[in-house]
From Swiss-Prot:
Homology family: Belongs to the complex I subunit 2 family.
Gene this chain is encoded by: MT-ND2
Entries under InterPro entries matching the protein: Complex_I_Subunit_2, NADH_DH_su2_C, NADH_UbQ_OxRdtase_chain2, ND/Mrp_TM
Compartments, record wording: Mitochondrion inner membrane
Official protein name in the record: NADH-ubiquinone oxidoreductase chain 2
Function, in words: Core subunit of the mitochondrial membrane respiratory chain NADH dehydrogenase (Complex I) which catalyzes electron transfer from NADH through the respiratory chain, using ubiquinone as an electron acceptor. Essential for the catalytic activity and assembly of complex I.
Membrane topology: Multi-pass membrane protein
Major location category of this protein: mitochondrion
Transmembrane intervals: 3-23, 25-45, 59-79, 96-116, 122-142, 145-165, 178-198, 202-222, 240-260, 276-296, 326-346
Gene source species: Peropteryx macrotis
EC number(s) given by UniProt: 7.1.1.2
Catalytic activity: a ubiquinone + NADH + 5 H(+)(in) = a ubiquinol + NAD(+) + 4 H(+)(out)
Keyword Electron transport found: yes
Length: 347
């Protein structure tokens, strides 16, 4: 890609997201989504090969369908209310269609099929943009319309996403697909608490972006995309490989790591709102994600035979390019649990 074009494309992506987040006019929100979608496609095709082309096509078709549904919901709401701006009273049909459109953009179950395929087909940098920045615009609109969202629909999709996010990752060897299924599960956790405490959804999103960005940055540092290459990186970069495995456990929600904090707060909030059965189901479904993360950690670090040349630690390590912000990111992504009392007071 031309170095002069890339900053313009990234600026358009950010501008599209910001338009969605700050607008109160439905047409401007739809335009922001379209700007964002059309600008992110060249980013997905940055590595020009058939797999990235296929991934970009799948992304375009899914997002175009979601945009069509969103416009349909906007028109139905316009016929019902007579105005283009946000209103507290929204037509129930428009609310359901809009929720379906936004969850399709997010990648919630049962509209999750595109997320692993697209993430696997693109580079690590494009995957990072797809699984972090691209979640901001749909979640900001869901946050705004939270009072009128159909609770049965969003809670059903949430629990389904958490279960599929766990089941889907069980037999994966590709790290990008594992992170894609992790994203589906995390989106399920975020949307489950949306109708009870929207602020907690934003806090969960912040922690999710922090952990996912750190994990992708570590993958980029050692240039690893599969579990096999991760285990082979052990003797070259033991510290970074250890950090990757700890980050995986944090994403799975193992206490006392940072990833446990949002799950703990969401379960507490659901219990407070007399949704004990839902909270129990979500906690059980979260064990699926934690299981495959722990299995990956065990297989990579604890089952290596110590005398093979492939696994011996080298005396002199290869010099690798390290990001200066990596150390604070790792600390924040693993050791934020002591801040739980302050975060609970804020909520």
């Amino acid at each position: 890609m031309n170095p002069l074009i890339f900053p313009i494309i990234m600026l358009t992506i950010m501008l599209g997201t910001l338009i969605v987040m700050i607008s109160s006019h439905w047409l401007m929100i739809w335009m922001g989504f379209e700007m964002n979608m059309l600008a992110v496609i060249p980013v997905l095709m940055k590595q020009y090969n058939p797999r990235s082309m296929e991934a970009a096509t799948k992304y375009f078709l899914t997002q175009a369908t979601a945009s069509m549904l969103l416009m349909l919901a906007i028109v139905i709401n316009l016929l019902h209310s007579g105005q283009w701006t946000f209103t507290k009273l929204m037509d129930p049909t428009a609310s359901i269609i809009m929720t379906l459109a936004l969850t399709m953009k997010l990648g919630l179950a049962p509209f999750h099929f595109w997320v692993p395929e697209v993430t696997q087909g693109v580079s690590l940098t494009s995957g990072l943009v797809l699984l972090t920045w691209q979640k901001l615009a749909p979640l900001s609109v869901l946050y705004t319309i939270a009072p009128v969202i159909n609770s049965d629909l969003i809670l059903t999709m949430s629990i389904l996403s958490i279960m599929i996010g766990g089941w889907g990752g069980l037999n994966q060897t590709q790290l990008r697909k594992i992170l894609a299924y992790s994203s589906i599960a995390h989106m399920g956790w975020m949307t489950s608490v949306l109708i009870f405490n929207p602020t907690m959804t934003l806090l969960n999103l912040l922690l999710y972006i922090l952990m996912t960005s750190t994990t992708f940055a570590l993958f980029m540092t050692v240039s690893t995309t599969t579990t096999l290459s991760l285990s082979h990186a052990w003797n070259k970069t033991p510290l970074i490989t250890t950090s990757i495995l700890i980050m995986m456990l944090s994403l799975g929600g193992l206490p006392p790591l940072t990833g446990f904090l949002p799950k703990w707060m969401i379960i507490q909030e659901l219990t407070k709102n007399d949704n004990i059965i839902l909270a129990t189901l979500m906690a059980i479904a979260a064990l699926l994600s934690l299981f495959f993360y722990m299995r990956l950690t065990y297989a990579t670090s604890l089952t290596m035979f110590p005398t093979t040349n492939n696994m011996k630690i080298k005396w002199q390590f290869n010099k690798i390019k390290q990001m200066k912000c990596l150390s604070p990111l790792i600390i924040l992504s693993t050791l934020t649990l002591p801040l739980a009392p302050a975060m609970m007071i804020l909520n």
